[in-house]
Swiss-Prot record:
One of its GO terms (cellular component) is photosystem I reaction center. The chain crosses the membrane at residues 80-100, 125-145. This is Photosystem I reaction center subunit XI. Its main location: membrane. It is found in: Cellular thylakoid membrane.
Length: 149
């Protein structure tokens, strides 16, 4: 039974990828294909903006609820400042990855695999993450939320 479900990818056991009913399903392939980094025909700044917006928005909540200022009146501001610091670190890491991974002036059919494309992705990430972090802060500050533990 296990032989029928899990088999080597493309029949080659040395590839290092197992083909399972989950990883080979059309639903999973469609979902992965629609992630921002894999969408075709977009400028690299747009996937970066989308990824940044998602990350900036969800980084603030854990800092507000679980951070060291969680029981104070400035928990939201503390969460914003901590989130901004983490976004800056993530942006620096993305920039460093681009510098060491892609040759200047290299050509590729995928814009995200060039130095210029990765730089645009990083810029989009930074703008999206900062914007959505401030949106999350605004929502937390201006809407009464239950603080019951």
């Amino acid at each position: 039974m296990a032989e029928e479900l899990v088999k080597p990818y493309n029949g080659d056991p040395f590839v290092g990828h197992l083909s399972t009913p989950i990883s080979d399903s059309g639903l999973v392939k469609t979902f992965i294909g629609n992630l921002p980094a894999y969408r075709q025909g977009l400028s690299p700044i747009l996937p970066g903006l989308e990824v940044g917006m998602a990350h900036g928005y969800f980084l603030i909540g854990p800092w507000v609820k679980l951070g060291p200022l969680r029981d104070s009146d400035v928990a939201n501001l503390g969460g914003l400042i901590s989130g901004i610091a983490l976004i800056l670190v993530a942006t620096a890491c993305l920039a460093a990855y681009g510098l060491v991974s892609f040759q200047k002036g290299g050509s590729s059919s995928d814009p995200l695999k060039t130095s210029e494309g990765w730089s645009q992705f990083t810029a989009g990430f930074f703008v999206g993450a900062m914007g959505s972090a401030f949106v999350a802060f605004f929502l937390l500050e201006n809407f009464l939320l239950s603080m019951a533990s």
